[in-house]
A protein has these predicted regions:
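An N-terminal assembly and electron-transfer interface module characteristic of large anaerobic redox
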Residues: 1-137
Length: 137
């Protein structure tokens, strides 16, 4: 959940509505994977969520963690780590989104990070902020 918390902090600090009110990010109380995906979707439906950002520090099956709701705009941050490169995950999940006709925005850092580095790299931060600003009314 460290990546999700870092993304939440970055977005809430840097993205605001036209009246200056910061956007609010909601993190699911459980991780998305298998049966938990339905719990996350149900929780998000009660929180007025309009966009979803999936993050993972590990290689996993993209279809396990992807948001299949047609009601939200999607983005995925794949961690570029020394032990677990997220490029394979990103390619798999982006292909799955494309096969389902769901547009999604991908984020992948240029520089490799250590697995215990929970910071959002500058290039990813710029992509994340731009993506989130595009979701505002």
């Amino acid at each position: 959940m460290a990546m999700a918390k870092a993304a939440k902090e970055l977005i809430e600090k840097n993205v605001h509505y036209q009246d200056g009110t910061p956007v609010e990010c909601v993190i699911s109380p459980c991780t998305i994977g298998g049966a938990e995906a339905a719990k996350c979707a149900e929780y998000f439906s009660t929180q007025n969520v309009c966009a979803s950002l999936a993050v993972t520090p590990c290689w996993c099956y993209g279809s396990e963690t992807m948001d299949l709701s047609g009601d939200t705009v999607k983005a995925v941050w794949g961690f570029n780590g020394t032990e677990r490169p997220g490029a394979v995950y990103l390619a798999a999940v982006m292909a799955a989104f494309a096969q389902r006709g769901l547009p999604a925005f991908l984020m992948y850092g240029h520089d490799v990070q250590d697995i215990d580095d929970n910071t959002v790299p500058d290039d990813v931060a710029e992509k994340m902020i731009r993506w989130q600003r595009a979701q505002l009314p």
